[in-house]
Amino acid sequence: MEHAPFVIPAQARSGPQLRDVLELLKPVTWFPPMWAFMCGVVSSGVPLADRWGLLIAGMMLAGPLVCGNSQAINDWFDRHVDAVNEPQRPIPSGRIPGRLGLYIAIAGSVISLLVGFVIGPVVGAATVVGVAMAWAYSAPPLRFKANGWLGPLVCAGAYEGVSWFTGAAVMAGGMPDARIIWILCMYALGAHGIMVLNDFKAVKGDAQFGVNSLPVQIGERNAAEIACWTMALPQVVVIILLARWGLHWPSAMVAFSLAMQAVLMQRVLAAPAANAPFYNATGTTLYVLGMLTAAFGLAQIA
């Protein structure tokens, strides 16, 4: 699909302000990966006092650097769509002029990689994966965000899986315990469903611009059912694994959380588009609290 030439408003070409760059990096999106990072820190079982400096560096890496950079990448490659849907965003409004948005994305990637490898080789390797996923999600030719199945999976893997792994690796000073990797993979897989629910807020716009989100592809009801099952089944695996490892209380608490989520899911299934925001504020909160519960459990056997 060809786009009309993208013209920067003449009055906005004087150069960006710091607040414009910060808006481009979307600080509100940093919380999920930083939460997952802290789950990784907790799950490692390593006392915080032993690695404070690396802990702070790792939090900056997971949030402002890798996640913030992914937002810059996404805004650059979505600038034509944003010019219609969100013309007030920094790039289409001209507050980030010319190709500066792309240069910020490239610089953010380089800085993220440098910080990752300064922390350690395992963290550096995880950063390579995270940065690669950010570009693959938004940029041609892969542009996974245009695929309703792969887009949420890549986003969930980066936000939850890579961030949790990074937190555990920072504290462990190397490769995390295999049991930690099992749990983070389950929660990353389950977060696919959370990402699908996020797509309900833009169903009309996605259909208009040819974005094949899952609700657009298979209908809202079917997409909601898949999202719910995708969130629930990995948590069942987490419950079983924690119990097998002797972590009965954490297992029971995650099971209780899942039972509460199942009740809330019924409301989503009744009216997916209308009730997805409600679930994101309630069921997703229970989901991420389950992540932290599992992390505290893993710390007992680290």
Where are these regions (language model features)?
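Multi-pass alpha-helical membrane architecture of UbiA-family
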Residues: M1-A302
